[in-house]
Amino acid sequence: MTLAEEKQVQRKAGITARRALAPETRAAANAALCARLAALPCFRQARTILLYAAFGGEADLATLAETARGLGKTLAYPVCGENFSLTAAVPGEDGWEAGAYGIRTPILSRAEILPPEALDLIFVPCTAFD
């Protein structure tokens, strides 16, 4: 099996395991993760944070986003474009739409766009980790 094939098998297994979690287990894990991330010095020091809108069983950082907003931090979310480009967008209250695959995505025309150097901390989703 090639490395690419091994990665695909691991990815599929990770997604399957993640989706099999009971709702209460998932909620407890999300709460614990958000609390742990909020306690990190890099989170406390960051003024502008790039988060993601959870999709398909990804770790849900909504509680972390609420904490960050309460601390006056600026929250940006990624918008994927052509050729794997990524835009950091700060959406307004009515600045969301269902993007590719139904993923909650900021509407660029209603968002403040931030340059990469404005981001102090970036959270990205992953399939699985140990």
Annotate the PLM regions.
Residues 122-130:
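Conserved Motif II region of HX4D acyltransferases
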Residues 2-118:
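N-terminal active-site beta-alpha-beta segment that forms phosphate/nucleotide-binding
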